[in-house]
């Protein structure tokens, strides 16, 4: 068995004295593991860092085997990804999200989204918005997609300011007003208003996706996967607060 594909490194773990098992995300073969011989060598260590884009060739006798990767570098981002807290926590949190999906299950749109996000992790506003949209895409692929395109009560497409915690559907201002205390806030940038994300809207968006991830994924699976995400959320919102306070009045 053999195939080749582009990939983004999600993580590695030691195997024996000189090798590693690499975890990558590919467009055609999903999240995939493979042994990299001499992966701890001076030549390979800089290549096998989370966030780097590589070309992999996977070989195994049988499809169900772990198999081996031959890895060639394409774009090495890791050096700059360790420069900011948003990027350090971000790449860890993205890997945690992708591990919610079955191994070797192709999700090409998530690979493309991942490639975009890792190039924007150092910009807190862009990284935060892209990360929230990535979480929504993962929820959708897991079968728990939110419908934010129209009001779940009236069908209206304007003044969408709430999300029902029960149905995961957007609710317009008029229909949701009597139940506002029970509703989740729908940030402007997710309601089709083409507004840029800011500290307040991102904080609301993080609460929104956290609610549905906890309800549908983490709690049913008994998974505690919040640490990297919490670190990313904290770093992103802190960076936006700092930028806002330093901006000219």
Swiss-Prot record:
GO terms for biological process: DNA recombination; double-strand break repair. GO terms for cellular component: bacterial nucleoid. It holds the Pfam family RecO_C. It comes from the Bacteria. Keywords: DNA damage, DNA recombination, DNA repair. SUPFAM superfamilies: ArfGap/RecO-like zinc finger, Nucleic acid-binding proteins. Involved in DNA repair and RecF pathway recombination. Belongs to the RecO family. HAMAP family: RecO. This is DNA repair protein RecO. It comes from Sinorhizobium medicae (strain WSM419) (Ensifer medicae). The gene is recO.
């Amino acid at each position: 068995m053999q195939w080749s594909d582009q990939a983004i490194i999600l993580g590695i773990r030691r195997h024996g004295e000189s090798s590693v098992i690499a975890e990558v995300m590919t467009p055609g073969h999903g999240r995939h593991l493979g042994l990299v011989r001499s992966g701890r060598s001076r030549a390979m260590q800089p290549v096998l860092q989370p966030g780097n884009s590589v070309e992999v060739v996977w070989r195994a006798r049988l499809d169900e085997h772990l198999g081996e990767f031959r890895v060639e570098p394409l774009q090495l981002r890791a050096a700059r990804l360790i420069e900011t807290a948003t990027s350090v926590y971000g790449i860890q949190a993205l890997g945690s999200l992708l591990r919610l999906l079955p191994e070797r299950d192709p999700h090409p749109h998530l690979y493309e989204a991942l490639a975009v996000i890792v190039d924007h992790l150092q910009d807190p506003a862009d990284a935060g918005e892209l990360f929230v949209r990535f979480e929504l895409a993962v929820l959708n692929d897991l079968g728990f997609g939110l419908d934010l395109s129209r009001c779940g009560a009236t069908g209206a497409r304007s003044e969408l300011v709430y999300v029902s915690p029960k149905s995961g559907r957007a609710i317009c201002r008029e229909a949701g007003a009597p139940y506002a205390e029970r509703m989740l806030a729908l940030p402007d940038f997710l309601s089709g208003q083409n507004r840029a994300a800011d500290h307040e809207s991102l904080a609301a968006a993080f609460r929104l996706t956290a609610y549905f991830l906890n309800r549908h994924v983490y709690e049913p699976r008994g998974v505690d996967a919040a640490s990297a995400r919490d670190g990313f959320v904290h770093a992103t919102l802190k960076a936006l607060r700092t930028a806002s306070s330093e901006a000219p009045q």
